Amino acid sequence: MPVDDQFTALHRAVLECAAAGCESIWINCNNDKVKLIRHTIGEYVEDPVYYNRHYAKFSSELKKYIPIFYCPNHPNDINKRDSYSWGVINAAMNANRSASKISRHLIPNKFYVAFPFGVYNPWVVQKHRRTIRSPQNFYLSCNGKTVKDGEYLGFTFDQKDLKAFKEHIKKTNTPAYKALSEFKSGGKWMERQPANERYSARFFTIDKIVKS
């Protein structure tokens, strides 16, 4: 979705993450869109705080690059729980998994979420960097509403929250089959649910997991 010439809604979300002080950026997307998005967005973005230090001595050496990684949905999740809310969880799990393969000390203790559908200035979060890095969760608000009200506004969560998000999806997602009775009696004891009732996590909005 283009916002301006050569600037898309996804560029806006990446810029917001950079302004928030993220050390790496993880983009969740469908597997068939990874190459296109990588070609459009690239492999890194410069930290705007360091980018604007034009008058510093050797300013080119002070640049800080933030790597961008792409997280396709797992085949087992497609058409089962690949909602926008699951995308947040999937990106965080990919960040954890990749970091743990190098060192447990690299596992992030906090995550910042930015949405392509956000319609606010991405620079507003830069002045809140210290708060975003603090132990308390951070929520952008507009007219008293936050992501908990279903608004596409930036927020943070930690590893404890991530665990709660995953548990909520696991407990509330409806399976493809439901039990007819506790024990087998004569005929079948499981039946396939109607298509519109299977895998309800496909339709979970972001507020459904954040409020869990």
PLM regions: where:
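Solvent-exposed, flexible loop/coil residues
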Residues: 4-7, 123-124, 208
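Conserved alpha/beta core of the MobA/IspD/sugar-nucleotide pyrophosphorylase nucleotidyltransferase superfamily
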Residues: 155-212
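N-terminal glycine-rich phosphate-binding loop and ensuing alpha1 helix
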Residues: 1-57
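Glutamate identity and glutamate-enriched acidic tracts
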Residues: 16, 23, 43-46, 61-64, ...
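Conserved beta-loop-beta/alpha segment of the NTase-like Rossmann-fold superfamily
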Residues: 36, 47, 54-172
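Flexible, charged surface loops at secondary-structure boundaries
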Residues: 19-21, 104-108, 128-135, 183-197, ...
